[in-house]
């Protein structure tokens, strides 16, 4: 729809300084604190436990939190820049005598490890719809809701390229959530 739009996607664990133009737009898993940013809540996510069907068939399906001690947990390091609700959930999982642990520095890495059958991963709820080979583990366990915000500097309020990107992201999230509701993957 916008062939001349150039996007430089940076998957960073640090908070970029938007007013200093480290980036034009950011999608953050918490409300931005800088006063001179325009912010729009896109959605809320929950962190949950996931594994492939093949992994669970081979290693068993945990029925309670204590059963996690028999599995490798794949997660982000709790000292990383992740949001508190996700870190709190991860710390809670790790209190169950987890012997085998694989930490990765971003959720894409956690997802890749899960898809390759390395264990049970802590991931955002929206991934289930796109990966039919994974299933939710311990469905009653999840983090508190984590708000996801789109943010950009006030000075870019009237930028057509920012508006195009904002509208595209908003529409894609709406469609993804709609499909998730229709398929029951919420």
Model feature map: region roles:
Residues 1, 168-176:
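Generic non-transmembrane alpha-helical segments
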């Amino acid at each position: 729809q916008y062939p001349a739009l150039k996007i430089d996607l940076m998957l960073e664990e640090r908070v970029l300084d938007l007013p200093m133009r480290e980036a034009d737009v950011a999608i953050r898993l918490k409300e931005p604190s800088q006063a001179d940013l325009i912010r729009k809540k896109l959605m809320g996510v929950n962190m949950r436990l996931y594994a492939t069907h093949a992994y669970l068939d081979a290693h068993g399906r945990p029925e309670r939190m204590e059963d996690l001690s028999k599995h490798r947990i794949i997660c982000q390091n709790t000292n990383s820049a992740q949001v508190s609700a996700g870190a709190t959930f991860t710390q809670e999982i790790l209190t169950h005598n987890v012997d085998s642990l694989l930490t990765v520095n971003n959720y894409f890495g956690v997802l890749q490890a899960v898809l390759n059958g390395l264990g049970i991963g802590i991931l955002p709820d929206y991934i289930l719809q796109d990966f039919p080979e994974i299933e939710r583990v311990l469905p009653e366990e999840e983090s508190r809701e984590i708000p996801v915000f789109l943010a950009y500097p006030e000075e870019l309020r009237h930028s057509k390229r920012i508006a195009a990107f904002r509208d595209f992201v908003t529409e894609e999230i709406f469609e993804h959530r709609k499909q998730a509701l229709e398929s029951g993957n919420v």
